[in-house]
Amino acid sequence: MQVSHSFASQSAVFDDDHLVSCAGLVPVMTLAQQTGLTGLLSEKVQIVAPRIKSGAANPSPKLATLIAGMCAGADCIDDIDLVRSGGMTTLFDGVYAPSTVGTLLREFTFGHARQLESVLRDHLVALCGRVDLLPDAAKGSVFIDIDSLLRPVYGRAKQGASYGHTKIAGKQILRKGLSPLATTISTAGSAPVIAGMRLRAGKTASAKGAGRMVAQAIRTARAAGASGQILVRGDSAYGNRAVVRSCLRAGARFSLVMIRNPAVERALAAIDESAWTPVSYPGAVQDPDTGAWISDAEVAEIPYTAFASTPDRITARLIVRRVKDARFPDALFPVWRYHPFFTNTDLPADQADITHRQHAIIETVFADLIDGPLAHIPSGRFGANSAWILCAAIAHNLLRAAGVLAGENHGRARGSTLRRKIVNIPARLRPAEWCTSRT
């Protein structure tokens, strides 16, 4: 492919106020208006004692401007200017400059972030009432997943930035950053939506605040129409008393990885060798005659009492998956890696294992956010960054709802695909009665 034009330094001038590059923002922000987003922002976000009085004025349209920019692909404060370019101000009223939005974000404190988090939850409920975001939630199973990620930062002035553990290429490393904690809601036939998100310092323990986050996510799922069984899934950081207690109080079931402490090790040793059953796993094949799996992975279960020395002791199922360690292919006897998780579901052990492994779906949400608004943590102020990630979560849910309305495969598409196919559509503005000739 060859370029068929030659350009001089003055040949490209973008001065047409009748052109827009993000025409798809019109239906997306119309959906936001139909679900009461601006009203929720006006009602719940109140900055009573601002440092800069003008900076805290009109938070609703300023935050709506930020959310619209994120839906169009903004990943830093300056990128919000794209909703003011060309003819965008003709399509939307109350569009604010990036500097004005940044001033508002820097007014946010911990309490204001909690206000914005309540907007996220209530708007998700409103979206579920307008769009079938969680199909079969009333009858089938609903899954709540909880996990955290570490977003790297590099500036010395970043409030809350500290060294925390993260895994890269399967190896645990220390990395400087900030650590959002997120909960998502999904069903078997839907992509996950974000029920809650909270920014924390990089060195914060993964489980801090997890019990409260899970309780809020369960309430949000119920309000969004999940009247069936709810299953809460998490990795070993969340296999603790607080999370289990929140699940039991709310009538939800749990499937949580357990840390291999001495009590768990004793339970593993007590499993009889004949109890292990091969299961579906990458590389496994199924016997065409018997239907049995020929696999390097096996599961078994045993009753287990967790938190036995506390008032929250509970007896349920300890399901263990063991996988042959690929580092020792020529060992005389198989060398196994064990992965135990604690659950009170009534699924068969092999199905419970598959359902538990589907907890990894939350990583698709993190991938969407990192490929969009969370490509950067833009501000030096912790409160501003807390507001930023919550607006990113609202934008994620809004795009997900727009994808469901668009139909076909858009309901489960990546965020970048939704922006490319739905939002970032160039268009020309013209009078409604403008005559055109057709030949």
Where do the model's predicted regions map?
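An anionic, glycine-rich sequence signature occurring as long contiguous blocks
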Residues: 1-14, 255-368
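A short, flexible helix-boundary coil/loop motif
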Residues: 395-439
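Acidic, His- and aromatic-enriched active-site or binding-groove loops in soluble protein domains
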Residues: 169-176, 249-264
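Short amphipathic alpha-helical "interface-anchor" segments enriched in bulky aromatics
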Residues: 31, 80, 349-387, 391-400
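Flexible loop/turn segments at secondary-structure boundaries
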Residues: 87-90, 151-153, 204, 237-242, ...
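Dynamic "connector" segments at or just before major functional cores
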Residues: 1-205, 210-224, 247, 272, ...
